[in-house]
Amino acid sequence: MPKMKTHRGAAKRVKRTGSGQLKRSRAFTSHLFANKNTKQKRQLRKAKLVSKSDMKRVKQLLAYKK
């Protein structure tokens, strides 16, 4: 059976924290800011941790990423 490969798209979007959790950036941040209020835009700047329900799937994509 061939080696698993790291999913390059996922690898560019997710970073591992010191405690081993996965950090990701938020969606809805590329355009259409006139329709979003200031609080919403401020909260979108903050990074978010990958949820527990998605963790297994994302870890498979990042098989060898440290």
From Swiss-Prot:
Keywords: Ribonucleoprotein, Ribosomal protein. Signal peptide: none annotated. GO terms for molecular function: structural constituent of ribosome. One of its GO terms (cellular component) is cytosolic large ribosomal subunit. Residues 1-28 are annotated as: Disordered. Residues 1-16 have a biased composition (Basic residues). One of its GO terms (biological process) is translation. Belongs to the bacterial ribosomal protein bL35 family. NCBIfam families: rpmI_bact (TIGR00001). This is Large ribosomal subunit protein bL35. The lineage of its organism: Bacteria, Bacillati, Bacillota, Bacilli, Bacillales.
